[in-house]
From Swiss-Prot:
Start-end of Basic and acidic residues biased regions: 108-125
Region (Disordered): 96-125
Coiled coil: 54-102
Keywords of the record: Coiled coil, Signal
Signal peptide: 1-21
Protein source organism: Rickettsia bellii (strain RML369-C)
Name assigned to this protein: Uncharacterized protein RBE_1357
Length: 125
């Protein structure tokens, strides 16, 4: 219930702030205007879709989100109980995982490019 109120208030603020921004910024480019129109269209489509969802489903989703918040809260509590050394280790571990992820993505991109090049070369033969 509270979550729905917060979402509604956020949507109202988003929509009213758009109008305020349009009034205060007269130097809007065509691209920005097109983006605003696209954003508004997407929001309208979402609200139309959300209106078709059954109340039971909304309640189920709300309970799910509350549980996720509780899980994340518990995770923060567990993390805070760790020693500083353990927290530092986890932070460093995360850095390495990100570097590996970036590295593997770069490797996959180069493999894809090489495969495409190999296919072009094979087509020429």
């Amino acid at each position: 219930m509270i979550r729905n109120i917060i979402i509604t208030i956020s949507a109202i603020l988003l929509l009213t702030s758009k109008g305020f921004a349009d009034d205060t910024i007269s130097n809007t480019s065509k691209k920005d205007t097109k983006t605003d129109i696209t954003t508004q269209k997407i929001l309208d489509e979402f609200y139309a879709y959300a209106g078709t969802i059954k109340p039971e489903i909304r309640e189920e989703i709300q309970k799910y989100r509350v549980e996720i918040v509780n899980i994340n809260k518990k995770k923060r509590e567990l993390y805070d109980k760790l020693s500083k050394e353990a927290q530092n280790f986890l932070a460093k571990e995360q850095e390495y995982k990100q570097r590996l992820s970036s590295s593997s993505m770069a490797t996959e991109d180069s493999k894809d490019n090489n495969t495409a090049k190999d296919n072009k070369d094979a087509d020429k033969k």
